[in-house]
Regions:
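Glycine-rich and polybasic anion-binding loops at the starts of cofactor/ligand-binding domains
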Residues: 1-189
């Protein structure tokens, strides 16, 4: 079996595992986006040394590990990270912890929505859905499709026009999963 086929076979098992965890979200816009991305990935080859942009990158070493889905932590502790005076949005193992978002950020007028919820909004101003569909329809890049197929979600951060915040927004990305896993959410700001 060719290396590419072995990798797709493994990713297929991971994708089925991801679908088994949807808990009522099967058929949602986000799930359909994952499926379309994975189907496109099946027919797209990963680059190799013959591709100029990837000549010096050991692509096989990047894609050959047995990736799994990142586990969502129920409890987290980020107090060990040196403090920056900022509004904080914690992301642990690729999952945005909405309960951990600084309440002052929300009260300042910033709207933070999970990507799943943001995709449900039908509006011409819905940049997340418009951008995702545009990129999905034009992408033939294997790594881009891989990220789209396996991202654990993401967030849309809406900052009203002319809003001035007293401090920056810090997205705290923490990965403590001991296994090699997919933990790359999509952010729209």
């Amino acid at each position: 079996m060719l290396e590419q086929e072995k990798i797709i076979e493994h990713l297929d098992a991971v994708f089925r595992d991801m679908e088994s965890r949807l808990n009522g979200r099967a058929g949602s816009l986000l799930h359909n986006f994952h499926k379309a991305s994975f189907e496109a990935l099946r027919s797209t080859h990963f680059p190799d040394r013959k591709h100029e942009d990837w000549r010096y990158t050991p692509v096989q070493r990047l894609i050959s590990p047995k990736y799994k889905l990142a586990e969502k932590k129920q409890q987290y502790n980020i107090s060990e990270i040196q403090e920056l005076d900022a509004f904080k949005i914690p992301v642990i193992n690729g999952h945005v912890i909405l309960d951990g978002v600084d309440a002052a950020l929300k009260s300042a007028g910033v709207i933070i929505r999970p990507l799943q919820e943001a995709m449900q909004i039908s509006s011409p101003e819905n940049n997340s859905t418009r951008w995702l569909h545009k990129v999905m329809n034009t992408s033939n890049q294997a790594f881009e499709l891989l990220n789209f197929a396996f991202h654990p979600g993401g967030i849309l951060i809406e900052i009203p026009k002319n809003l001035s915040l007293s401090k920056p927004i810090e997205i705290q990305i923490i990965h403590d999963d001991p296994d090699i896993s997919f933990s790359h959410p999509i952010y729209f700001i």
